[in-house]
């Protein structure tokens, strides 16, 4: 009997000992199999191996990394985010080499989404970023059924510096919709693609709408300086759409001779044209625009007053401070938000208090306007307000808060990573875009005051 008990003790003790020790990391066999599958581009097989792991198993970092890379290749960024969190715990510094492709995957995986608004959002953000490595995705966008997607794709190709070598962008000059053709003209002319000049001359000769103005502008960029006369003349034509196009172009070209025409636009009978003129004076960027913008602050149209306030802030002239401070008491809340933005652009962080009040307004569009205004500063109190708006019940304030954080010089990456899990897909895409903005200049962003 004693001998039997001794034998049982010897046999059982190893199992008892093993039960008390942590589960060992998964052995090399599974890792080698996953590596081989990955090297053969069998990404589904890699994930099949990954998900076959028992829940109690401790996976090795190389295996997690293989699964992470496979989810990116398959366009499944939500799964990749979970794996990233396993690779880089929240108490460790982020790895840009992993976080950047993860953020980009959120955008590229939605460019073919069934919902048009999602595709528009993805391409709009890609246009803001201008990433050369997305050329294939951007050129695919030129074939989308949505006019806005095609337009944003053309813009993005130009911003990415790809216009000069993009055959699909040249073909977009023949698109059925003017907005796409205009975007293609702008991108190609900025890339100094000279051989489109005959096309541009023909458009300028035959079109009597806004498209002709953009053709003139493209010709001007390509060296035909006399086109400035045609653009200036278009700013006084009967069609308000043509006048707006001309004023917008003149503001961007920033020619000293254009000031009188831009100033005259502030007195246009159409409020939409006056607003365009106010915005163009902000683009023009010269102190000589203060006079007409000051007049615009008294306009009957709240939209005109709001754009004028933003433009005054963009000029960066501190003498405009009293004008903007007075506008924070405007009857229209959107105008107040624009005045706050203008003050913040002038470095007046006391305006953050006013932004905080607007961020509590019952109208979600006003809360969104407050978030937009706060993009003009990296002050820590501004970040706190934006962080609160990230919890808003309505998507619009959350969306603008996420975009504002992308422009912040404060350390906001942890906040943006959290928003990658938002319930609204458009906000997740905006968070990805803001993360890419943050990763672009991690060391040169201004410090929070």
Located regions from the model:
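Short inter-helical turns and helix N-cap capping residues of alpha-solenoid HEAT/ARM repeat scaffolds
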Residues: 114-115, 145-146, 176-177, 207-208, ...
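Bacterial N-terminal signal peptides
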Residues: 2-14
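Core register positions within helices of long alpha-helical scaffolds
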Residues: 70, 94-98, 125-128, 156, ...
